[in-house]
């Protein structure tokens, strides 16, 4: 039922003319991410790298009671459109979310949470920094682990914090659930 709900909602919620097209493979990617949130039903969540809010919407469909803190510097060429789209999704779907518009690399700490989604800076240093920002969060979902720099950051983070990562390939990208 959750998978179908996401398959129905995402295409309608997609930003018009987004360079990142919504297709069946992309929908499966968001379904895989939402399944992690559905399994744990967090009260609070942190999302580093929220962009247009597609993951946030998928997480909301999986766990509508979760309160989210989203962090994004919105520094790309399409960032203003993405930010406005994010605001519309949050309002339209009544998502409990607050945003910090800041480059996560400028942060030294974030509040406690039950779940974190790390999908911000995809450089090794940026991904590792973001993971350390949420090091005390019990379950971390790291996206884009098919990117060698991100995967290495996840592996090094897990080695230094004595945590485990379960890597999965959703057909579009590789995800890591860190516990």
Predicted regions and their residues:
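S-adenosylmethionine/decaboxylated-SAM
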Residues: 19, 31-179
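Class I SAM-dependent methyltransferase Rossmann-like catalytic core
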Residues: 2-40
